[in-house]
C-alpha cells in the first residue's frame, strides 16, 4: 500500500455532536475515612482531556487538518476549560453556550491505577431548542469536505435529520458513529460506522459472513445510506455498498491495551481521508491502520500523521512516533510491563548530520526502546541564539521519526528536560559530549529511581555549527 499517504493537504472537517470534558484526579490511598467506610484519596495530580465529539475533533487536529467543532456547552468553568483545551490544539470551537445546562463533565478519581469513582455532571439536551446550532451548521458546512455527527445519546443530535438534510443540500458527505438501536433516525446519511454489537442489535444476530453482508445491504437500502462500515474488533472491519463487492480489512493491531476512543479514531481518519478526495477503499484502509495504532495505547488517545505514515509503510521500529508527555508515560508503562529497557536522550537536533545518526544508533543499542526529547523552538532560541533553530520543531521531529533507531519522540519547552525525565524515569539516561554524569539534567531523578546514566562520545568533526558555517561560506 505504498501509494497511500497520511498527508491530507486538501481536507477540512466539521464535527458536530455531544462534547464533553473528561477530568481525572490521581492520588494516594492509605487509609479509610473515619466518617464512613470509604477510602480517603489524597489528590496529588489532575488531568483534563477532551471527550465525546471533542475527542473526535482532537483526532482530526492531530493529523494537521483544519477542524471546526460544534456542540452545546454550559456557561460555566468546565465549558471554558474545554474550549481552552481545544483551542490549544488549534481546533475552531463554535459552541452554543446555554444558561440552563452544565457542560457535560465526567470526573474520575483514581488511585494505584484503579478507578475508584466516577462523577457525571450532565443534563440531557433533548428539551433544548437547537435552532442556533442548526443555523451555525447551515452557515459553515459548505466550507468543509466532510461532516461528522458524533452521537453519544446526550441530545445534541435530537434534530439529526435536519442536520443530515442541511449537509446533503450542500453536497457534503455525512458520517455518523451511531448510538442506540434507532438507526432510522440517520436516514440519508452517507455512512454509518457501527461496531459489531451495535450492528447486531439493529439487524439481529449474524452467524456467518454472508449474513453480515445480506443484512448490512438491507440496512443500507432501508435507511438510504451510501455505505456502511462495520467495525469488528479482532476481525477487522467490513465496508458494504450497494452493487459493489464487500471490502474487508483484517485488523492490523499487534497488541491491544485499550479500545477506549478507537471508534472516534476510525471515523476521524475516515472523514479526513474522504474530505481529502480519497476513495472509500483507501479511506477505510487508513482508518483501519489508525485503529491498529490507537488500541496499542492506554486511555483515550490520538494518532499523529507520522505514526500513520510509519504504519502504512510498515516501519515497526519507529513504534508510536511523536507523542505528548501523557501518551509517552502510558507507552513507557506498557513497555516496562513487557520487561523492555527504556533509554532516553535529548537535544535540539536542528540540522541532522552523521554524528547525530551514529549517536542515536549507539544509544538505541543500549536498550529496547529509545526516547528522544526534543527542545521546542523557543527553547532552542534561548540556548542557541535568535538565529536558531534553522528547522522548526515539527520538521525536526519528522526527520527524527524516520530513523529506525528512534522509537518515541516528545517535545519539551523548558531549557532542560529535567522535569520530563523525572516524569518518565527511564532505565538509562544517555547524553552525548564531555559531560560528567552528575552534570546531566535528570540524572538525580534517574539514579533515585534505580536507573543509570551514561555519557556517549560524538563523532569528531560532526556538529550543527560546522554545517551552518559551511553553508555561510557557500553563500559568501
Swiss-Prot record:
KW ATP-binding (keyword) present: yes
UniProtKB keywords: ATP-binding, Carbohydrate metabolism, Kinase, Multifunctional enzyme, Nucleotide-binding, Nucleotidyltransferase, Transferase
Pathways per UniProt: Nucleotide-sugar biosynthesis; ADP-L-glycero-beta-D-manno-heptose biosynthesis; ADP-L-glycero-beta-D-manno-heptose from D-glycero-beta-D-manno-heptose 7-phosphate: step 1/4; Nucleotide-sugar biosynthesis; ADP-L-glycero-beta-D-manno-heptose biosynthesis; ADP-L-glycero-beta-D-manno-heptose from D-glycero-beta-D-manno-heptose 7-phosphate: step 3/4
Gene Ontology cellular component annotations, sorted alphabetically: cytosol
Top-level enzyme category: transferase
UniProt-listed GO biological process terms: ADP-L-glycero-beta-D-manno-heptose biosynthetic process
Chain positions covered by the region annotation Cytidylyltransferase: 344-476
Active-site residue numbers: 264
Disulfide-bonded cysteines: none
Function: Catalyzes the ADP transfer from ATP to D-glycero-beta-D-manno-heptose 1-phosphate, yielding ADP-D-glycero-beta-D-manno-heptose.
Family: In the N-terminal section; belongs to the carbohydrate kinase PfkB family.
Protein known as: Bifunctional protein HldE
Native species: Haemophilus influenzae (strain PittGG)
Lineage: Bacteria, Pseudomonadati, Pseudomonadota, Gammaproteobacteria, Pasteurellales
Amino acid at each position: 500500500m505504498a501509494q497511500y499517504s497520511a498527508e491530507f493537504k486538501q481536507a477540512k472537517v466539521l464535527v458536530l455532536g455531544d462534547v464533553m470534558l473528561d477530568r481525572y484526579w490521581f492520588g494516594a490511598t492509605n487509609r479509610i475515612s473515619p466518617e464512613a467506610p470509604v477510602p480517603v484519596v489524597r489528590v496529588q495530580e489532575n488531568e483534563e482531556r477532551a471527550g465525546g465529539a471533542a475527542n473526535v475533533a482532537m483526532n482530526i487536529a492531530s493529523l494537521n487538518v483544519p477542524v471546526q467543532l460544534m456542540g452545546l456547552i454550559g456557561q460555566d468553568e468546565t465549558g471554558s476549560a474545554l474550549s481552552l483545551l481545544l483551542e490549544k490544539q488549534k481546533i475552531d470551537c463554535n459552541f452554543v453556550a446555554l444558561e440552563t445546562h452544565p457542560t457535560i463533565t465526567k470526573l474520575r478519581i483514581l488511585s494505584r491505577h484503579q478507578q475508584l469513582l466516577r462523577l457525571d455532571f450532565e443534563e440531557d439536551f433533548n428539551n433544548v431548542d437547537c435552532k442556533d446550532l442548526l443555523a451555525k451548521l447551515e452557515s459553515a458546512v459548505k466550507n468543509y469536505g466532510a461532516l461528522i455527527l458524533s452521537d453519544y445519546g446526550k441530545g445534541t443530535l435530537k434534530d439529526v435529520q435536519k442536520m443530515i438534510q442541511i449537509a446533503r443540500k450542500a453536497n457534503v458527505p455525512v458520517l455518523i458513529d451511531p448510538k442506540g438501536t434507532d438507526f432510522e433516525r440517520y436516514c440519508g446519511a452517507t455512512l454509518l460506522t457501527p461496531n459489531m454489537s451495535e450492528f447486531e442489535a439493529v439487524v439481529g444476530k449474524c452467524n456467518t459472513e454472508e449474513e453480515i453482508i445480506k443484512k448490512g445491504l438491507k440496512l443500507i437500502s432501508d435507511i438510504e445510506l451510501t455505505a456502511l462500515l462495520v467495525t469488528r474488533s479482532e476481525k477487522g472491519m467490513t465496508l458494504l455498498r450497494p452493487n459493489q463487492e464487500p471490502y474487508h480489512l483484517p485488523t492490523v493491531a499487534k497488541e491491544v491495551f485499550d479500545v477506549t476512543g478507537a471508534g472516534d479514531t476510525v471515523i476521524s481518519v475516515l472523514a479526513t481521508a474522504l474530505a481529502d478526495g480519497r476513495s472509500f477503499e483507501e479511506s477505510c484502509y487508513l482508518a483501519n491502520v489508525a485503529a491498529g495504532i490507537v488500541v496499542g495505547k492506554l486511555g483515550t488517545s490520538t494518532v499523529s500523521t507520522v505514526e500513520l505514515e510509519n504504519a502504512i509503510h510498515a516501519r515497526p521500529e519507529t513504534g508510536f512516533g511523536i507523542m505528548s508527555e501523557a501518551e509517552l508515560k502510558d507507552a513507557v508503562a506498557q513497555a516496562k510491563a513487557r520487561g523492555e529497557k527504556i533509554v532516553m536522550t535529548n537535544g535540539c537536533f536542528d540540522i541532522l548530520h552523521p554524528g547525530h545518526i551514529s549517536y542515536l544508533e549507539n544509544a538505541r543499542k543500549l536498550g529496547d526502546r529509545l526516547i528522544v526529547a526534543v527542545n521546542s523552538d523557543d527553547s532552542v532560541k534561548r540556548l542557541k541564539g535568535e538565529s536558531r533553530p534553522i528547522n522548526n520543531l515539527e520538521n525536526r521531529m519528522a526527520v527524527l521519526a524516520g530513523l529506525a533507531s528512534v522509537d518515541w519522540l516528545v517535545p519539551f519547552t523548558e531549557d532542560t528536560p529535567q522535569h520530563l525525565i523525572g516524569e518518565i524515569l527511564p532505565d538509562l539516561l544517555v547524553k552525548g559530549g564531555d559531560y560528567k554524569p552528575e552534570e546531566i539534567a535528570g540524572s538525580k531523578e534517574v539514579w533515585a529511581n534505580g536507573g543509570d546514566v551514561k555519557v556517549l562520545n560524538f563523532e569528531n568533526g560532526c556538529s550543527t555549527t560546522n554545517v551552518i558555517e559551511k553553508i555561510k561560506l557557500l553563500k559568501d
